[in-house]
Every structure is written in C-alpha cells, then in structure tokens.
Curated annotation (Swiss-Prot):
The gene is hisS. Homodimer. GO terms for biological process: histidyl-tRNA aminoacylation. It comes from Prochlorococcus marinus (strain NATL2A). HAMAP family: His_tRNA_synth (MF_00127). This is Histidine--tRNA ligase. SUPFAM superfamilies: Class II aaRS ABD-related, Class II aaRS and biotin synthetases. It is found in: Cytoplasm. Belongs to the class-II aminoacyl-tRNA synthetase family.
Length: 426
C-alpha cells in the first residue's frame, strides 16, 4: 500500500513550529489593533477572472503560477495566489467604501505553482495590510511604518527598506515605450526570459535576477527620469516623511514589483540572511484596482509579509514553545479525579497546565515533568487525597534549598496557590 504524503511544496506545520506562528500572529493582532486596523477574511477560492483582471494577464503569477480548475458547474476557479485582489473584490462587493476609507489587515494561505525552496513553498502564508480610499502620501508613509515597526516587534533588526516611484499610468506608458526601444536594440544580449518579456511586460525586466542582464540594465533608461512633476513631488515628500519617522531607506530605481496594479510608491523590506529569497515584505500603491473590479475610484496602498520567511529570520527565539507553569502528577483513581478537577481550575486562571495521562510511576512522571520544562510539579497521590493535602515541588532553580522548593497545602488553599503562581509569571 502506498504511503500517503503531503504534496510537494505543501508543508505541514507541526506542533514544534506552530507556537512560533501563533506568537507572530498575536503580535500582529496587537500591533494592528493599536494602529486602528480591522481584520478581513476572504475565501481561499475565487473566480479566475478576479486575478486575470486584478493582477494582470501578462504577469508571471497569472501566466505560469496559478492553481486554476473548472468546478462541477463549469466555472473557472483559482486558489488565491495573493491577498490584495480578494480584499479589493470583497470591498467592492459589499460596498465597504460607503462607510468611508478602509484600513484592513488579513492573514492566511496563498498558492502558487513555483519551485519549492527555503522560504518559498507552493502553499505559503501571508499577513497583509490594505489602506483603501486614501490618496495622501502620509498614508504611504504610515503603511510603510506599520510594516517596519511590526517586523521590529517580532524581533527582526537587520533589515533594509527599498523604495521607488512607479509614477502614474501616463508616466509608465511613456517610459515603457522608451525602455522597449532601448531593449530591442540590445535584444541578443538579453537572457531568454527577458527577451520574452520585452513586448509583454518590459518593466519586469528591470527586476531580472540574471547577472548579465542586470549588468546591461545599469545603462538602461531610468523611470525616475520620466516622472511628472506631480509624481516627483509625491516621491520627494515620501522620503521626507520617512526621514521624520527615523526609518532608514534606500532608493532602488529598478524596483517594480511583480503585479500590474501598482503605481507611484513601491517598496520592499529585505534581509541579507535569506539568500536569493531576500524579500520579507513587499507592497505599494494601487490606485486603479478597485475601479478595475467595478468599484469607485479609490486610491489605495498595501503590503504583504511572507510568514515562512519571517519565521526563518526570527529563528529559534520565536519558535520556542511556552513551558507549562505546572505539570500535574497523579497516581490512583481518586487522585486522577482530583488532578483533573484542579487542572481545570488552574487553567481558568490563565495558567499553562499540563496533566500527565500515563498512569506510570511517580519517578517516570517526574522525568516527563522535567522534560516539559515546567516550573512546578503538582503531586497528587492516594496519601495526599486521604489527608486532603496537595504537594507542590519546584522543578527549576534547583540551586535553592530543598525546603524552599516544596510546599504542602490543602485544597481549600488553592486560591492562594493560584495567586502565588500568577505573581511568579509577572
């Protein structure tokens, strides 16, 4: 019989890692709540047309990477490859902009058929932020600061913020024609992928990872030289705001992002510790997406962070699981019942309690308690039950005297024990 395994690029999140993910998500919830953001959750499966219209038919995501299929009703459906288009669709469908600008965040799995590698899987997870209905450059700076400070809250320090201006649609159209002419004159010097992109999506060539093409592009026309005065003013003001916020940045004139809906501000936060997959966070302004999907004209800006890459960068510190406050050891039928009762009482006070279910000897249960890294062991045997007493033994700080590591108390004193344990946690 064939052993069933997960599909390539679809990774199980095991208990040893899940607590680290929960910690990151709890930091996100607290951080975004302080920023006045509200969470939105959208379906994993959407109509394929949403992404072909929203992301762009000529992008790599739509052309090569989407998981698309026809359902039993003959409708073309796609596992979402990113979150912004789904959020935009939901805003339009439910008329959320009738209530004013929307400041939203989301989280969840996304799907792209790519070659799996560290930090890039076919099912991957994102946390993202979207400001919809806000045109001000101040909103650009705030969105970037939320990403920057969130990553700092998670414990990431060695990061680089890269910014660029993609200008308006008019700016880009003029630049595209100039760039295409320049590239066509050097067609034979380009790598194969770039040759295919010249007439389809020439801006993506600026982001080529091919070394010879990158060297050639150092002499290419720059989008910054084709920006209107209005676009230049926006970009200059963004830089001024970032300086005021004490957020260091670098200008990367070849930063274009991979999706067609971006305009004006584009940015990435990168790390040198991720190898070729250096981008931790990417985003930008998308002023035409909402109207493209049938909604009103609604200037917007947002970003997404890849959870897998964030967890890799955070390292062992974020993955450390929380140790129990108390490991409950028991032996005997009556002791078992009392152990369950007290475990539930302690948990109701927000203490982390692990109850032993093995029924093995006290010595083996103590070994498991030590392995759990619990601070205390609560010991309940038949003798303790008959005497109406409970025994607490300190499992850590073993350098202290034995007497200070052991406490005997009655069940009626449980409230005092709870207060003691809570005080220790603070």
């Amino acid at each position: 019989m064939t052993n069933l395994k997960n599909l390539r690029g679809m990774v199980d999140l095991l208990p040893a890692q899940s607590q680290g993910w929960q910690k990151v998500e709890s930091i996100a919830l607290e951080h975004f709540s302080r920023a006045g953001l509200q969470e939105i959750r959208t379906p994993i499966i959407e109509q394929t047309e949403l992404f072909s219209r929203g992301i762009g038919e000529n992008t790599d995501v739509v052309g090569k990477e989407m998981y698309s299929f026809d359902d039993r009703g003959g409708r073309s459906c796609t596992l979402r490859p990113e979150g912004t288009a789904s959020v935009a669709r939901s805003i339009v469908q439910h008329g959320l902009l009738n209530k004013g600008p929307q400041r939203l965040w989301y989280r969840g799995p996304m799907f792209r058929y790519e070659r799996p590698q560290a930090g890039r899987q076919r099912q991957f997870h994102q946390i993202g932020v979207e400001f919809v209905g806000l045109a001000s450059v101040i909103s650009d700076a705030e969105v970037i600061s939320i990403a920057w400070n969130f990553l700092k809250d998670v414990g990431l320090n060695e990061l680089t913020l890269e910014i660029n201006s993609l200008g308006s649609n008019e700016d880009r159209n003029i630049f595209k024609e100039e760039l295409k002419d320049w590239l066509n004159q050097r067609f034979d010097l380009l790598d194969e992928d770039s040759q295919k992109r010249i007439n389809v999506n020439p801006l993506r060539i600026l982001d080529s990872k091919n070394n010879s093409t990158k060297e050639l592009l150092s002499e290419a026309p720059s989008l910054i030289d084709f920006l209107s005065n209005e676009s230049k003013t926006r970009f200059d003001y963004l830089q001024e705001l970032l300086v005021n916020l004490k957020i260091p940045y670098e200008i990367n004139y070849n930063l274009v992002r991979g999706l067609d809906y971006y305009s004006h501000t584009a940015f990435e936060i990168t790390s040198d510790h991720l190898g070729s997959q250096a981008t931790v966070c990417g985003g930008g302004r998308y002023d035409g997406l909402i109207s493209e999907l049938g909604g009103p004209q609604a200037p917007s800006i947002g970003w997404a962070i890849g959870m897998e890459r964030l967890i890799i960068l955070a390292g062992d510190k974020i993955l450390q699981s929380k140790s129990p406050d108390v490991y409950v050891i028991h032996k005997g039928k009556k002791a078992e019942q009392l152990a369950l009762e007290i475990t539930c009482q302690l948990r109701s006070s927000n203490l982390i309690i692990e109850l032993d279910y093995s029924g093995s000897s006290f010595s083996k249960q103590f070994k498991r308690a030590d392995k759990s890294r619990a601070k205390w062991a609560l010991v309940i045997g038949e003798d303790e039950v008959s005497k109406g007493q409970l025994l607490m033994k300190k499992l850590r700080d073993k350098q202290k005297d034995e007497e200070s590591r052991e406490y005997i108390f009655s069940k009626s004193d449980l409230d005092q024990l709870i207060k003691k344990l809570i005080a220790e946690k603070k």
